[in-house]
Design a protein with these regions (language model features):
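N-terminal beta-strand motif that seeds the catalytic metal site of vicinal oxygen chelate
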Residues: 1-25, 84-91, 147, 152-159
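Vicinal oxygen chelate
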Residues: 2-5, 18-26, 30-36, 52-53, 61, 79-159
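Short, structured motif recognition centered on aromatic/hydrophobic residues
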Residues: 11, 15, 28, 53, ...
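An N-terminus-focused feature that recognizes amino-terminal "leader" regions
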Residues: 27-31, 38-47, 67, 143
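N-terminal strand-loop-strand beta-hairpin
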Residues: 34-55, 59, 131
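Helix-adjacent hinge/juxtasegments
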Residues: 62-90
Length: 159
């Protein structure tokens, strides 16, 4: 059955919490032919290392905390295993997506990288997180910037 939500365009990315991004990337390289030379980006502001690649048209992020009490390390410790941390849904209108979710009882979660609630600028677009997990998976909405907006929000790179 297909969703009738006209605001959701599709999956922007899926983020996996891993203990070791390099090791996890090695498994994806062996089993799914993801290029082994995929770069692992370091994000000093949020203190994460992230291997980013595309598979089947979907962006995958293998996210490793650089500190023991970091966002992804805590998530792994709470659950006792690595796994799918969140799915980011690309939306046409983030305010409409949030209004719909909140009308259905959803609460907003603080963005752990920015310490902000609700819609706010991020490197690729406006984002917001729901506090309510769906089957143990966090939900993120992103309204991707237009090319003009991308230049305007260049300062948010590296979060």
């Amino acid at each position: 059955m297909k969703s009738d939500n006209p605001n959701v365009r599709g999956i922007k990315h899926m983020a996996f919490a891993v203990r070791d991004a390099e090791k996890a990337l090695g498994a994806y390289a062996r089993f799914l032919h993801v290029p082994a030379e995929t770069e692992i980006n370091v994000y000093p502001k949020s203190k994460n290392r992230v291997a980013l690649f595309y598979l089947g048209g979907i962006e995958y992020q293998l996210c490793e905390s650089m500190e023991l009490d970091g966002r992804f390390a805590k998530w792994i410790d709470e659950r006792g295993a690595e796994g799918l941390h969140h799915i980011c849904y690309e939306v046409d209108d983030i305010d409409a997506a949030l209004a719909h979710a909140q009308a259905e009882g959803a609460n907003l979660r603080i963005c752990q990288a920015c310490e902000l609630y609700g819609s706010h600028p991020h490197p690729e677009g406006w984002v917001a997180f729901l506090d309510d997990e769906a089957g143990g998976i966090e939900i993120e909405f992103m309204q991707v910037y237009t090319p003009e907006q991308l230049k305007e929000y260049e300062d948010f790179k590296g979060i």
